[in-house]
A protein has these predicted regions:
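Metal-dependent enolase-superfamily TIM-barrel catalytic cores that perform enediolate-based chemistry
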Residues: 131-242
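Sec-dependent signal peptide recognition
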Residues: 2-7
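Short, basic, helix/turn surface patches
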Residues: 85-90, 201-202, 225-226, 250-256, ...
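Boundary at the C-terminal end of the N-terminal hydrophobic targeting segment
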Residues: 17-19
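Metal- or metallocofactor-binding catalytic centers and their adjacent structured scaffolds
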Residues: 24, 53, 58-126
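Conserved, mostly hydrophobic/aromatic
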Residues: 50, 56, 115, 128, ...
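Flexible C-terminal active-site loop/helix
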Residues: 22-30, 41, 47, 55, ...
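Catalytic alpha/beta core domains of metabolic enzymes, predominantly
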Residues: 230-235, 239-322
Length: 356
């Protein structure tokens, strides 16, 4: 242990004396198929790529900005422009760096996540370890990922289900007209388990319960964010009556949100773009477990950079939804793989990625 501590101190002193290069640039993610949600449809997602270099070692990070987060390429790049690179000179001081970023502006979690991910990638490379190894996690415990299928025409749906064949769990977006027909169509193709994401699409607890009772007979694992994120009482009422677990998504962003949700939900969906990065996401998983809640690790539509960063936490999760990189046509990185439907973590130092 003393040797490990001595090495850690040496590494900190080594990197803290070097100049820091911070680079960032917009990068639009092109979707392979239109992505249909309860409230919108889109064919691309804006993103910003981040690179932090110290002593010729580069860490990569990413900000993905789906519209509901309220961030944009403009807001992310403006925030990143505020950062003094010298404040990143000790990349191991994550708590201090997050405090510094919070002092620059509140919110901006996707922008902060990009810095956080790049710092994790950088420090892992300096230590020569993947972050799941640094966390002390067993990669064999990483669950199978779900694969998202959205509302579409019957022909298009058949094509998407064919693409989803290698995956053991299907994720379905509900809360839009025709969503029950979508489930029935899927059931005519496959009996694989389904997890349902409503994206706040049901309007009342009674409507939600009616749908959940129907879903409970169709091999559904859980229901994600059935009601408005602000409807705490509605979710508490629903949780008492639901035969399926109720998982918070839009209602939870950081660990500060979790205690109030413990009576309303059975679990939480942790996403790096909501939490501000891996540092906070790890805290969230630990706190949720302490409160007896289920843990899901999810993602936005992202390259393999952010998805592989989230995957470092996968062994902590009951479920993972890490297919964001599979949904885009212009990935910049190679990273974690899905083998027989299961998240497989490479031992590549950092967050497990290599730039193409």
């Amino acid at each position: 242990m003393e040797k490990i501590i001595a090495l850690f101190v040496f590494l900190i002193s080594l990197v803290s004396s070097n100049a820091v290069e911070l680079r960032f640039y917009p990068y639009e993610l092109k979707l392979r198929h239109a992505f249909n949600l309860a409230s919108m449809s889109r064919t691309s997602t804006p993103g910003v790529q981040v690179e932090i270099t110290i002593d010729s070692i580069t860490g990569y990070g990413e900000a993905s900005m789906p519209p509901y987060l309220g961030e944009s390429v403009k807001s992310v790049t403006e925030f990143l422009s505020l950062i003094d690179p010298s404040r990143l000179s000790d990349p191991f001081a994550l708590e201090d760096i997050h405090a510094y970023m919070d002092s620059l502006a509140t919110g901006n979690r996707a922008a902060k996540a990009a810095i956080d991910i790049a710092l994790h990638d950088l420090t892992g490379k300096i230590m020569g370890r993947a972050w799941y190894q640094i966390y002390g996690l067993d990669p064999a415990l990483a669950p199978c990922t779900s694969y998202t299928v959205s509302v579409d025409s019957p022909d298009e749906l058949s094509r998407k289900l064919a693409e989803a064949e290698p995956y053991r769990i299907i994720k379905v977006k509900m809360g839009v007209p025709g969503d029950r027909e979508l489930i029935e169509t899927i059931r005519r193709h496959t009996d694989r388990p389904i997890c349902v994401d409503v994206n706040q699409g049901w309007k009342s607890p009674e409507e939600a319960l009616d749908n959940i009772m129907w879903l409970a007979t169709r091999n559904v694992l859980f229901v994600e964010q059935p009601l408005s994120k602000s409807d705490f009482e509605g979710h508490a009422w629903l949780r008492e009556r639901s035969p399926l677990p109720i998982i918070a998504d839009e209602a939870v962003q950081t660990s500060a949100d979790i205690p109030a949700l413990a009576r309303c939900y059975d679990g939480i969906n942790i996403k790096l773009m909501k939490s501000g990065g891996m540092h906070e996401a790890y805290k969230m998983a630990v706190l949720a477990r302490a409160l007896g809640m289920k843990v899901m690790i999810g993602c936005m539509t992202e390259t393999s950079c952010a998805v592989s960063a989230a995957a470092q936490l996968a062994p902590l999760a009951d479920w993972v939804d890490l297919d964001g990189n599979l949904l885009i046509a212009n990935d910049l990185f190679d990273g974690m793989k899905i083998v027989d439907g299961k998240v497989t973590l490479p031992s590549t130092p950092g967050i497990g990625i290599e730039k193409r």
